[in-house]
């Protein structure tokens, strides 16, 4: 730790660290808290910030007030990002839960997002297994297992073959 950083108050150092973290990408409040509490890797090894619980709360409140930290924005962007990567709603819900987002906030954001999960599952399956999708049972099971692993719901997966038969 340099002499100039050791003289800065813990609140200022925490605030600087929070803004740097949030400048890279959106985080949930729980993620930001976890990263702020973690020791900083300095030139001479891990460095602790001598901050109180009140300092952490003030930093989180400041980030909320100035629009740097917004869980609803984080959830909307996270859903859009993960769906573009081919993940289904079940997997996205689980990941948001792990990031400390409440079930109510997740469900609200899932209802508000304009994503056709069935079409997304079909696109993902055709990218992996080519068009036309197989109708042989053993091949269908393989695709079904793949899509379930990616987090798609069984009803969306079954709709692929229902729509395919039409």
UniProtKB/Swiss-Prot annotation:
One of its GO terms (biological process) is regulation of DNA repair. It is found in: Cytoplasm. Keywords: Cytoplasm. The keyword Hydrolase does not apply. The keyword Zinc-finger does not apply. One of its GO terms (cellular component) is cytoplasm. Belongs to the RecX family. HAMAP family: RecX (MF_01114). This is Regulatory protein RecX.
């Amino acid at each position: 730790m340099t002499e100039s950083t050791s003289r800065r108050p813990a609140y200022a150092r925490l605030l600087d660290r929070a803004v740097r973290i949030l400048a890279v990408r959106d985080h949930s409040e729980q993620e930001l808290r976890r990263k702020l509490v973690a020791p900083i890797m300095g030139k001479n090894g891990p460095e602790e910030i001598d901050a109180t619980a009140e300092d952490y709360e003030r930093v989180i409140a400041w980030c909320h007030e100035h629009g740097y930290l917004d869980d609803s924005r984080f959830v909307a962007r996270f859903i859009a990002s993960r769906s573009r990567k081919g993940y289904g709603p079940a997997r996205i819900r689980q990941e948001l839960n792990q990031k400390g987002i409440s079930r109510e906030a997740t469900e609200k954001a899932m209802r508000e997002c304009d994503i056709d999960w069935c079409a997304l599952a079909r696109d993902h399956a055709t990218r992996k297994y080519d068009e036309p999708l197989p109708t042989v049972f053993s091949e269908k099971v393989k695709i079904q297992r793949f899509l379930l692993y990616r987090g798609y719901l069984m009803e969306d997966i079954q709709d692929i073959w229902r729509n395919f038969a039409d």
